[in-house]
Design a protein with these regions (language model features):
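Sec-dependent N-terminal signal peptides of Gram-positive bacterial secreted proteins and lipoproteins
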Residues: 3-31
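Acidic, metal/ion-coordinating pockets
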Residues: 26-55, 59-415
Length: 415
């Protein structure tokens, strides 16, 4: 009898629960009329359903978030600057600003850091070897303290070109020391290599679904040469080697960046080498060509590619910073653009391409004395007062505008 009563009670409770759940689903349950056992069952079932729904929603959210993470933007920002040419006036002042015990290059770049920081791909031509293996040296055999490298990486530069005529100023030992330093910074460096195997390995980086390859070549190395068995550089007259490298890079990357140290010093006009080899680089697969060496600015333009796309060429970015005593050498450019890739066709285009003028500034009391306040300004912020203080005789707004006349209006951006 007790068993039968117990079974009946269980049956009643179960039926009540089922009826109640049905009522809940219809939105018309009066829980005040349920006994405790039935209410407990209902609450448990309801909580289970809610948890199941929450788990399902949470799972869907995770799946959506994962899908969002897996989809790159296929667009990125890029800046490139010219020769980071560290004369003795610059590093001597940095040593004073560091209290005589360390180098502080903050003043040198403080006015232009805003153009670099936060950029996805930021490229600089490091014109002087960065190494602490020798004492800092100036023209004609440059060597700069590693504090220079620390500063430019801190600014946001993550790609360093070493393809320039001063790369062998301290011989193979100095070059290897500089390569060792850059290896510690976690950035891409190219244009000079520790071995043939290193030279044959194309340097790449991928940003937001866009893969970049970097190659660098120079016209000469000031009469200094390597033995051939160890460290390597590639000269612009080695066209067969350059062609093979660019074609290989074109197969493995969306954007092939080629740094060329070419042009006639202190001349805005293009020379024969520039006009002859640049179209070849584009024909072989170069997408962005960055020109340095002349220490003055030159024109920039799009060139048609064989595949129907367009490459862009900055023929001469001038100096990023220096204390060269020449009015033309005080004017440089920051190249700036957006790189956009169509994920369906893999076609890459450059948008919002700019050439932003900058001014190397320094003051002094005599030609053979120390020059000070060595820094670089955006031309947009270079006041008449600064023109008056600049130590280079004859440096005027008119002389700047003369240099800027070589830049097409569609790209010139004074900002």
């Amino acid at each position: 009898m007790k068993y039968r009563l117990l079974c009946n009670k269980i049956t009643v409770v179960a039926l009540s629960a089922l009826l109640s759940l049905s009522a809940v689903s219809c939105g018309r349950l009066d829980t005040s009329k349920l006994d405790g056992n039935a209410l407990t069952v209902i609450e448990a079932e309801s909580k289970a359903e809610v948890k199941k729904t929450e788990d399902s929603s949470s799972k869907k959210e995770v799946e959506v978030n994962e899908e969002e993470k897996e989809q790159p933007s296929y667009t990125c920002s890029l800046v490139c600057v010219g020769d980071n040419l560290i004369h003795d006036n610059i590093y001597n002042e940095a040593l004073k600003l560091g209290g005589g015990e360390k180098y502080d290059f903050t003043q040198a770049y403080e006015h232009v850091t805003k153009y670099i920081e936060g950029t996805d791909v930021a490229i600089i031509n490091q014109e002087t070897l960065v190494t602490d293996s020798v004492e800092p040296q100036s023209y004609p055999m440059f060597a700069s303290p590693t504090a220079v490298g620390d500063k430019i990486v801190d600014m946001g530069f993550n790609v360093v070109s070493m393809s320039n005529n001063h790369v062998l100023d301290q011989g193979e030992e100095g070059l290897i020391s500089s390569l060792d330093y850059w290896d510690t910074k976690g950035i891409v460096h190219y244009g000079a290599y520790r071995s043939q195997e290193d030279a044959d390995t194309i340097k790449t980086m991928e940003v937001n679904g866009i893969k970049f390859a970097f190659l660098g070549y120079m016209e000469h190395t000031n009469g200094n040469y390597l033995s051939g068995d160890g460290a390597q550089v590639i000269y612009l007259d080695e066209e067969d080697k350059i062609k093979a490298q660019i074609e290989e890079a074109d197969k493995m990357a969306d954007v092939v960046v080629v740094s060329c140290h070419y042009g006639t010093e202190i001349q805005n006009e293009l020379n024969e080498q520039q006009t002859e080899i640049t179209p070849k680089l584009v024909e072989w697969g170069a997408d962005l060509i960055i020109g340095t060496q002349a220490h003055t600015i030159s024109t920039c333009e799009y060139l048609d590619k064989p595949d129907g796309g367009q490459a862009f060429v900055y023929y001469g970015l001038g100096n990023f910073i220096s204390t060269m005593y020449d009015t033309k050498s005080l004017v440089g450019l920051i190249g700036k653009l957006n790189v956009v890739k169509d994920p369906d066709t893999n076609e890459v285009t450059f948008e919002n391409v700019k050439a932003i003028p900058i001014i190397s500034h320094f003051e002094g009391d005599s030609y053979y004395g120390d020059w000070y306040n060595c820094t670089v300004y955006p031309y947009a912020e270079y006041t008449d007062e600064l023109f008056a203080k600049n130590y280079v005789e004859g440096f005027t707004r008119e002389s700047v505008e003369q240099c800027l006349s070589y830049i097409p209006d569609e790209f010139l951006s004074i900002e």
